[in-house]
Curated annotation (Swiss-Prot):
Record-annotated PH domain positions: 400-508
Name under which the protein is recorded: Unc-112-related protein
Organism, scientific name: Drosophila melanogaster (Fruit fly)
One Gene Ontology cellular component: cell-substrate junction
Modified residues (Phosphothreonine): T211
Record Pfam families: FERM_M, Kindlin_2_N, PH
Keyword Glycoprotein: no
Residue span, FERM domain: 274-602
Gene: Fit1
């Protein structure tokens, strides 16, 4: 270290706004805030309050202004940047439109998402996060096999590269198509950015520091290509109204960028790009004008209310729609046509009621006087607090509910061709009992008994063939044993709705006494009804005006071929009476009922095994799954989990359960991504209407950050 004078040394700092490098004489015990104060020219009338020191070589912000240079580790050979904390980020919304937004690059990613959602009028921002856009190359190899790119940083003498911290997601995109730090976002001759399809507006010069939060008179102006820019002349109302309605289809170049997985392996590799919520986005290789995707990350949506969540519901509907069109989820043919019909109804209602005319929410109470408004508000409050069935007569609460009927049963066995056998089923207290006859159920012991608590439930329904089957993967009675597979077949849809609802509740550890049983039955009936052949005449529409590729996945397009439009219009007759908001809500509910909904996949290797397997992470459990078939080998519930932690040195994760410990390494993503998913879902489970308080950001980071 070269010292100049008494315990002083030279520190080089680049003021990025002015592109001027200054050399200050400092001491090691000088505070960071004092260094910034010495940088500012008092004669220059500029607001520097949004600026902070960034250390490119270490890839960290020096935001603790009371810390000294010695405490921060800054030495004479260090080179710092004095740069704005708020920078422009291009954000792709779930409906695939882009907006340019001023984000605090020094705040934790979680805080940046919360701030963005607040401006966009999206409640419960903890359900969303940023992820880096992917390209086809990312699906060809596991994360562990991808070239381990370091984060490029600008130094005085050129570009340097730093290794991401061990306890963060170290994924850096292979190419520079979305990342500006390697020069890929240099402006073109017409001033447009190259990080995404060029937008027709000309980018303005850098605006004064500040965010839409601090500028309540700002607006976002949209154009036909799906881009939005910030203009400080009016309010956010136009933006929120626009985000509550989405165009029918994105531009062709945006759609062409979509990455379509072709197997379970590729679906698992889709999850490599999630940002670390505990670090700032700049510390994760994201630079100004780069693109990030805003997506619903945790598939547990709290208190969806059409009255308050128009933007949230629309963006959720759009994410659901694209997950189906992009073949991330694969519904049956009947389910696909139901989704297409609901989407067609959404588009039809949007054409009938453009933004600003009708929101799709029932406002009839406004016409009937103030007393009805009060009654309506009280009823809504009661439903919110008690649930949909709260006001109904629940009967004798001391009697344990029971379900019984004749059904067919099958336990698949290797090398046998045995078919279904008829039994008299009774279900009570999470236990399924099978008898040879109803008379035997009154006096004899059951022939077969199955504990359904924590089972995996998969529907197998074909309305055209009259097939109503339920596949159950039941936890083994042997300690640490694999799941066993059994099938239950119902005679009709009414029987199926009751038993399927019971099985779904059992999977969550809930019995028939749970207040949500009736609503679960009603939801299943409603979904089946929408998949039936329509009774009424289809809407009079010119088939040539319907573009089937906007409603069907490529695989289903090939299957239906020339009959696609006709089948969509026939299915639409079932849902043609739905309002805009009802159609979106039905779509979301149907999406949530799909077998693979809400299961985030990762490729892993268990400790001591060379074989790759799938790990599924859901809102209440993690699952060991077969890589080829997707069968559930073993399920572990979060309520049996004592601790989970990561060895950051070898990127290995250990989960301590009541009966066993499991250790695995993650192949398809960084270990931090899995760690954060588990902690995030546990955080989501702590929410309740009785405890509907301010978002506890500290608790979120404690559960997801990998440190206490």
């Amino acid at each position: 270290m070269i010292h100049v004078g008494e315990n002083t040394w030279n520190l080089r700092i680049l003021i990025t706004d002015l592109q001027v490098e200054k050399t200050l004489r400092v001491k090691g015990d000088q505070h960071i805030g004092g260094v910034m104060l010495n940088l500012v020219d008092p004669e220059l009338p500029k607001d520097w309050s949004d600026h902070a020191l960034w250390w490119p070589a270490k890839n960290i912000w020096l935001t603790r202004t009371r810390s000294t240079l010695d405490q921060a580790g800054v030495q004479s050979d260090s080179f710092l940047h004095f740069t704005p904390m708020h920078k422009t980020l291009r954000v792709q919304m779930p409906d695939l439109r882009y907006l340019d937004y001023r984000v605090n690059f020094s705040a934790k990613t979680f805080g940046a998402v919360v701030s963005l959602c607040k401006d966009l009028d999206i409640r419960y921002p903890e359900e969303l996060s940023f992820c880096k856009p992917l390209e086809p190359e990312h699906l060809k190899k596991n994360f562990s096999k991808l070239p381990q790119r370091k984060i490029p940083v600008a130094e005085a003498n050129g570009i340097a590269y730093v290794q991401p911290a061990l306890d963060t997601n170290s994924f850096v995109p292979i190419t520079g198509a979305y990342n500006g730090s390697n020069g890929s976002l240099d402006r073109s001759h017409n001033g447009n950015l190259l990080c995404a399809p060029a937008s027709p507006y000309t980018r303005r010069a850098a605006t004064a520091p500040g965010t839409p939060i601090s500028s309540p008179t700002g607006t976002w102006k949209h154009n036909s290509t799906g881009y939005a820019s910030y203009d400080s002349n009016s309010s956010f109302g136009d933006l929120q109204e626009n985000l509550a309605m989405s165009p029918r289809s994105p531009s062709p170049d945006v759609r062409a960028r979509l990455v379509r997985p072709k197997s379970r392996v590729e679906k698992a590799r889709l999850n490599v790009g999630w940002l670390d919520s505990s670090l700032s986005i700049m510390e994760q290789g994201v630079r100004e004008y780069d693109t990030l995707c805003l997506r619903f990350k945790y598939f547990t949506f709290f208190d969806l209310n059409p009255k308050y969540d128009q933007v949230r519901i629309n963006q959720l509907y759009e994410q659901a729609k694209w997950s189906i069109l992009n073949e991330e989820l694969e519904p049956t043919e009947e389910e696909t046509l139901m989704f297409a019909a609901l989407q067609f109804q959404v588009n039809h209602q949007t054409d009938l009621h453009p933004p600003g005319i009708d929101s799709g929410i029932d406002t009839s109470s406004q016409e009937t006087g103030g007393e009805d408004d009060i009654d309506s508000a009280l009823n809504e409050l009661q439903i919110t607090l008690e649930g949909p069935g709260g006001g109904k007569d629940q009967g004798n609460i001391t009697r344990i509910p029971e379900l019984s009927d004749y059904l067919k049963f099958l336990k698949p066995q290797r090398f046998t061709l045995k078919g279904y056998k008829r039994y008299f089923f009774t279900y009570r207290d999470l236990h399924l009992h099978l008898y040879k006859s109803q008379d035997e159920s009154r006096r004899g012991a059951p022939t077969i008994s199955i504990n359904l608590k924590g089972c995996e439930v998969t529907p197998d329904v074909n309305l055209a063939q009259g097939k109503f089957a339920i596949r159950l993967e039941v936890p083994s009675e042997i300690r640490n044993g694999p799941n066993s597979e059994v099938w239950v077949r119902c005679d009709n849809e009414e029987q199926y709705a009751k038993w399927m609802a019971a099985c779904r509740l059992a999977a969550k550890g809930r019995s028939l006494a749970d207040s949500s049983y009736d609503s679960e039955v009603s939801s299943i009936r409603s979904l089946l009804q929408m998949q039936k052949p329509a009774q009424g005449a289809p809407l009079t529409v010119n088939p040539r005006s319907v573009e089937p590729m906007d409603y069907l996945s490529p695989k289903m397009m090939r299957k239906l071929s020339s009959k696609a439009v006709q089948r969509i219009l026939e299915a639409h007759a079932n849902v043609r009476q739905l309002s805009l908001m009802d159609a979106k809500m039905k779509y979301i509910q149907a999406w949530q009922s799909l077998p693979d909904f809400g299961v985030t996949l990762f490729i892993i290797k268990f400790d001591g095994h060379k074989k790759e397997e799938l790990l599924g992470v859901a809102n209440n459990r993690i699952m060991r799954m077969d890589l080829n078939t997707g069968d559930h080998i073993k399920t572990w519930r979060y309520n049996t989990m004592k601790a989970w932690n990561v060895n950051w040195g070898i990127k290995c994760m250990m989960i301590q359960l009541q009966d066993e410990n499991i250790v695995f390494s993650v192949q398809s993503a960084d270990c931090k991504v899995v760690h954060e998913f588990i902690g995030g879902y546990i955080f989501m489970s702590m929410r309740s209407k009785e405890n509907n308080q301010t978002l506890n950001e500290e608790m979120f980071h404690k559960l997801t950050g990998g440190w206490s």
